[in-house]
């Protein structure tokens, strides 16, 4: 009996030693978050001594809301949104930067819309929530007078002809456009313009980081290891993504997720490079801060140092 109780105490001690973290990606399971699923399934988080619980947001309740209310410890978030929230008073800390190139596209429905000037005064589809701040600023700066038509998700507005063009992510909605029979339509990638700013990063609150520095750093290193493994083993990583999607009953298919994974891995690398750095560039942050201030999205400069919250 004493031996049995001793074994239970050992097991309990082992569980306590592993620090619990609740991690929430921006969306439901998909290849955009493959590195974290790999780190979980391959035991990289366990090896780092951190117990991670991956919880996905709902359509009506975002990852940021979960972080704000304390239900999540670590989330993914786009850089533009993170800087805006910091300016509003949310003390966010960037602990890992996965994206290096912008994935936003402006896709025309007509062969005649090819330059920014061509889109002036046109009706363009835009998400009701998120991802469009750079497009709005592009509209104002270039005096395009775009008539924005909101949609929740999917490309039905574009496919039905209700808009002249639409915003789309290169790793997601653009595939829907291509398979709907519009594969040869002109488009503009924001990554080919002055609005090419990185997107996905991983964030915690400053308070959580200060109180849990070691386990946050362990999470970061295990996540980096997961993403590096994905770059080296994309097909097996895709198997893991599909397993997570099935578990969460996400309606998708391997073709869509394969497209997404290939594009996400490309966007994780700087132009001309084939390996990710996982870091933010100080000059990029400075340029984005200046742009956001010019458009009154933020009211004071935000530096790389402030984004990193004292992290090396």
Residue ranges and their predicted role:
Residues 44, 50, 90, 182, ...:
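Helix N-cap/coil-helix junction residues
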Residues 145-148, 184-187, 247-263, 299-306:
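Short, surface-exposed acidic
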Residues 212-295:
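Secondary-structure end/capping motifs
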Residues 15-49, 282-312:
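N-terminal hydrophobic or amphipathic helices and topogenic motifs
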Residues 4-14:
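Sec-dependent N-terminal signal peptides
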């Amino acid at each position: 009996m004493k031996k049995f109780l001793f074994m239970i105490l050992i097991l309990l001690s082992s569980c306590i030693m592993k620090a619990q973290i609740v991690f929430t990606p921006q969306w439901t399971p998909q290849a955009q978050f493959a590195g974290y699923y790999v780190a979980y399934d391959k035991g990289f988080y366990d090896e780092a001594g951190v117990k991670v619980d991956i919880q996905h947001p709902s359509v009506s309740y975002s990852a940021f809301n979960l972080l704000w209310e304390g239900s999540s410890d670590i989330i993914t978030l786009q850089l533009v949104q993170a800087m805006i929230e910091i300016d509003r008073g949310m003390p966010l800390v960037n602990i890992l930067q996965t994206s290096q190139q912008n994935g936003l596209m402006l896709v025309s429905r007509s062969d005649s819309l090819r330059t920014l000037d061509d889109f002036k005064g046109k009706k363009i589809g835009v998400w009701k929530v998120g991802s469009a701040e750079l497009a709005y600023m592009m509209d104002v700066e270039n005096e395009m007078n775009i008539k924005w038509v909101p949609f929740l998700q999917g490309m039905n507005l574009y496919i039905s002809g209700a808009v002249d063009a639409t915003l789309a992510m290169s790793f997601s909605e653009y595939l829907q456009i291509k398979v709907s029979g519009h594969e040869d339509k002109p488009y503009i990638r924001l990554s080919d313009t002055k609005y090419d700013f990185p997107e996905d990063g991983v964030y915690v609150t400053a308070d959580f980081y200060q109180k849990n520095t070691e386990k946050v750093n362990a999470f970061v290193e295990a996540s980096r290891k997961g993403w590096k493994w994905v770059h080296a083993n994309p097909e097996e990583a895709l198997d893991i993504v599909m397993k997570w999607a099935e578990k969460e009953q996400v309606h998708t298919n391997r073709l869509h997720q394969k497209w997404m994974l290939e594009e996400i891995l490309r966007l994780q690398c700087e132009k001309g490079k084939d390996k990710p750095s996982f870091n933010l560039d100080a000059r990029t942050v400075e340029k984005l801060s200046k742009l956001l201030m010019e458009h009154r999205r933020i009211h004071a400069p935000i530096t790389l140092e402030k984004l990193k919250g004292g992290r090396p």
